[in-house]
Amino acid sequence: MYSFNSRIRYSEVDKNAELTIEALINYFQDCTIFQTEDGPANMAYLNDLGAAWVLNSWQIDILRHPKLNEEVVIGTVPYMIKGPMGFRNFFMDTAGGERLAVANSIWTLFDFNKGVPIKATDRMIEAYPVEDKLEMDYGSRKIAIPEDGTRYEAEEIVVRNYHLDTNNHVNNGQYIRMALDSLKAQNVKVSHLRAEYKKQALLGDIIHPVVIENNLGDNNIYTVSLNNDEGETVCVIQLTV
């Protein structure tokens, strides 16, 4: 396990002074980058190989949204590396040990020079010692787009520089912000999130969000398909509020 301590900042909260979902994802992404940079297979090593870990899917369960100034612990637990695939959990706890959020993620090691997945090297395996997976209700990596429900198209989004990460692709967390901004209902409090990443979006690409809303008991479930100009799904996100 790898972890670091932090405190919820004003720049990370919404109008209710609670941590936003994209800020939570940023914490998780920072945690895995910190572990990578502190180990023998850092980003410079990956760059020399022309490789990067590409996120396939998220599942995030939020038990409570922490508030401004709360002290928190963010951690990650790699639990399996198999061929080109990496599997890791994340968590956010309070300083007192209350679990605030738990997540599962699946990654592929991709060689951008050859355009193919590649097997993790011994150095990478050393960098990410595996442990037992965390307790959570593990769902499918695949997200089916519902045929029923209330469907509408949201305003198109042009990919800007601020959407990009160091791989010159849209950052994983930015897709979540796009999905949230596409909802007619604003300032929703997300309790569960799933995301399946299918393609990479680049600078200047146009994203066409399609939202399908369904009800399940007391919850609203929003499935957001972020499509490219060809109508292909770049990323599909499911939000339970």
Where are these regions (language model features)?
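Hydrophobic beta-strand-centered segment that forms part of the acyl-chain substrate-binding groove
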Residues: 35-73, 77-80, 85, 174-213, ...
